Amino acid sequence: MDGRQHSEDARKLIHILFGGCAFLLRYLAWHEAALVAIGALAFNLAIMPRVGAAIYRPADRTRRYLHGIVLYPVAVLGLILLFPYRLDIAAAAWGILALGDGMASIVGRRWGRRRIPWNRDKSIAGSVALFLCGGAAGAFLAWWCRPAVIPPPFLWFSLGVPFVAALVAAFAETIPVRLDDNILVPGSAAAVLWVFSLMSEDLIRSFVMDAGMQVLIAAAVNGTAAWIGFRLRTVTTAGAVAGAVIGTTIAAATSWNGWMLLLMTFLVASISSRLGVHRKTLLGIAEERGGQRGAGNAVANTGLAAVAALMAVLTNSRDAAMVAFAAALAAAGSDTIASEIGKAWGRRTYLITNLQAVRPGTSGAISLEGTAAGFVGALLLGAAAVALSVIPSSALFPVVAGATLGAFVESLLGATLEARGILNNDLLNFINTAVAATTAVLLMGTA
């Protein structure tokens, strides 16, 4: 074993061992647990650079602070502050980060010859290790901290859901961006755990028993629609499969009214992508694959809507979930309209951070024409949601406001983080829908 691999293993061993502190969450109040995370952060900032320099990578030894040793305790602190009364969720996500991400690195270096097709820096063996080891650690810690939650969560949640969270985290880790794994892995895992924590066991049982025929019909319709989309070259093969799964989920959970809103969003995105193709091609900013939508695009733009649709039938917050569903789709559709209209017919394009003129298609660029078109698109999709009885008329303003804010946040992050490779377009699209859904639900709560 050479010195470089030895230091890598030493770093990951420390990474894994820090996860042992998660066992304390069974006995600590949230503010006490937060102090532990703050203490770890202070140690990593003040002491680790002096005593642990030998295990640093050569390129890191000239830096005062390393992202990893700072972001790890920051992520743990964030988990504790976000889930002060569900420390089992914080512990499970912490375990997935500690053992899952740690073993992914160790296994990937030793046996990771087969690489992930869309990210050659990641290996299949490493992703499998993250899923298995992270899922096991998350499940054990969720079970261990179960007595600290009042009332205790269902046993199926503690022992089963962490594996689902680890699977999502393993996929998220393969996304080709520079967003640190210490944020991406626990963040995605905690989001999955939180969604499942809101679900009612009785509603799950009722949905499983009653939705069988609806699921079959939805699968047949969406499979056919996906095949037609593939034949018309509006989606790739992977995009067709992802779209069929998402469409089936939405149709089964929200009835055909919700599915019609999804279809309208897809049609709007596909049509707007084909507007002004000649100018976009000349400028070198035409959509890849001739505007065909891939799996990443489908999940980024409509994945959150599918989750909201499931929450509408599996939680006791149906009204809020349906508002989130409509806002996510309105944001996805209006964002595509704004982007494509801006690139096709925008006369002047400005960077949102400093309003300097930039070329159309620049990350974070906005135009008057695109912004206006996006607002109109959000309004039309929101009105369609009202007409389809997906949301009440009182939710129209929150949905449009959420979609508009989501678009501006996406542009801001595009100008700052996408340009540096920390985020990519698919992650920006997902953040856009998340901001829209969250904003709409919060506005409905204050109405």
Locations of regions flagged by a protein language model:
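Hydrophobic alpha-helical transmembrane segments
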Residues: 1-118, 127-338, 342-447
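Short, acidic/turn-prone active-site loops that include or flank metal/cofactor-
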Residues: 121
